[in-house]
A protein has these predicted regions:
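Catalytic-core helical/loop segments in enzymes performing group transfer/polymerization on anionic/lipid-linked
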Residues: 1-468
Length: 468
């Protein structure tokens, strides 16, 4: 039985988990990744040790936040996102696309605590249409302390409800299931209570926003904490972030999960491709009427604004991403680094590959501690930090290597073929929807031949069009 089937089987057995909601938001959905982790066989979440690095707090962002909450109250379209998506020369191209698509749109932006992204707000030509949410973080700390007793009461009521639900169920099958139940009883009430407090505060912050026609979440905590408490009647929308594959805990839900929290599941989805639309209709609880296919707005706007690199393709580019797709990332670096060391050796010694150099692009959530780890273990490679322009690098790369990163799809659109390194037994068909070439410790020599290279690239581009 696949991980997906195991999770859905667990959820169908305990469907009451979807009934514990805060203004229509099912709190359990925040725990699907963690439940999946336990079901997959890892009894405890493991953390990779690396340098803890935090970006600055910008008082000016907090001040602007306080001022703009009042200034923007007549806006018709509210977009919730994060400065983490300022990945293209300091701009959030997907948010810009949404601002053009919907009337009188403004963007509410969480800080990422990544300096290169947070500071980009100050240089943005569209700054007047952005409102940092930084002040919420400050106000929440004060508000939650003042309402600590209420939070404790909410937590205990939720815990009692969970205990009662589970006690009425018979046939807990094994130790893993018991472990999951204990975890949910311990942790889910905390999330429930903090969500109630968070929604209370957002209700106060947005209480005078009476002209809302559209509320859009683009990885901005909108669907959980903000959209459920906005005033008036409006359309709730979510822009797809990342590639949705056969199993994605943020989109693939069991049948009948939407019977209780109807408003949460009734949101409109803006998707990248027809294959994703088909997947959500057939495998999840969404209907065709809820879905609009728009392509990948970030890539569309990037090519429109910046074009594509005309420089020589010099890199063999590895995209690092232990946080993405993968719930079992504890051994990621110890497995990836030896493979990359072998690739570096091949580039140094094999005449066919000597004109290329190994480069590593960090995931946006990997910091300088990881940069140092790669540089220490593979000193001849070039490591690009988490703020480097991904699409620019793809345009300069002859080949893209990854374990499970969905950058594969983006690479194909920038004419860069992808090969996979093995990791945790994942199959490319399960992750990407089609077969992808794999390597162990050596790059495939056939791709040096231009005809085979072009044929493989054409294959990847054709497959990618289903998803992008």
């Amino acid at each position: 039985m696949s991980i997906e089937e195991t999770l859905l089987r667990f959820e169908k057995k305990y469907m009451f988990l979807y009934e514990i909601e805060v203004n229509g938001f099912p709190v359990y959905t925040c725990f699907r990744d963690r439940v999946n982790l336990l079901l997959s066989g890892d009894e405890a979440e493991k953390k990779v040790e690396y340098e803890n690095e935090k970006g600055r707090i910008y008082p000016k962002r907090i001040w602007d936040s306080l001022l703009k909450y009042r200034k923007l109250k007549k806006s018709k379209t509210l977009i919730f996102t994060s400065s983490m998506f300022r990945r293209d020369y300091g701009r959030n191209l997907a948010a810009e696309y949404l601002m053009e698509k919907y009337p009188d749109a403004v963007v509410f932006e969480w800080p990422s605590r990544t300096d290169a992204y947070d500071v980009a707000y100050f240089q943005d030509s569209k700054k007047d249409r952005y409102c940092p949410i930084d002040c919420y973080i400050l106000v929440y700390k004060i508000y939650s302390r003042l309402h600590r007793k209420e939070e404790i009461i909410l937590e205990e009521k939720c815990r009692k409800r969970l205990v009662d639900y589970f006690e009425n169920e018979n046939g807990v099958e094994d130790g893993v299931e018991k472990q999951i139940i204990n975890m949910l009883i311990q942790e889910m009430p905390k999330s429930y209570a903090s969500t109630v407090i968070s929604q209370q505060l957002f209700r106060k912050l947005f209480r005078k926003y009476n002209n809302i026609e559209y509320a859009i979440d683009f990885w901005g905590s909108g669907r959980e904490n903000i959209i459920p408490v906005l005033p008036g009647e409006f359309e709730s929308i979510e822009l797809q972030h990342g590639i949705i594959t056969e199993f994605h805990p943020g989109y693939i839900y069991p049948t009948k999960a939407n019977e209780k929290c109807k408003r949460f599941f009734a949101r409109t989805l803006l998707l990248y491709g027809e294959a994703t639309k088909k997947l959500l209709i057939q495998k999840s609880v969404f209907t065709e009427e809820q879905i609009e296919v728009i392509g990948n707005p970030r890539i569309l706007k990037y090519k429109q604004e910046f074009g594509e690199s005309s420089e020589k393709r010099q890199y063999i580019l590895f995209t690092s991403q232990p946080f993405e797709q993968d719930v079992k990332g504890a051994e990621y670096y110890s497995e990836m680094i030896p493979i990359l060391q072998s690739v570096q050796k091949q580039l140094n010694t094999d005449e066919k590959w000597k004109k290329y150099s190994l480069a590593i692009k960090l995931h946006p959530r990997e910091n300088n501690g990881i940069k140092n780890k790669y540089e220490e273990n593979i000193p001849e490679c070039k490591v690009f930090d988490n703020a480097t322009q991904l699409y620019e690098l793809l345009g300069k790369s002859f080949l893209h290597i990854t374990a499970t990163s969905t950058t594969l799809y983006e690479a194909a659109l920038f004419d860069t073929p992808t090969v996979l390194v093995p990791y945790q037994g994942y199959k490319s068909e399960d992750i990407f929807g089609f077969n992808v070439k794999k390597i162990n410790n050596k790059l495939p020599d056939e791709l040096v031949e231009s005809e085979k290279y072009e044929d493989y690239l054409k294959y990847l581009k054709n497959q990618t069009m289903n998803y992008m």
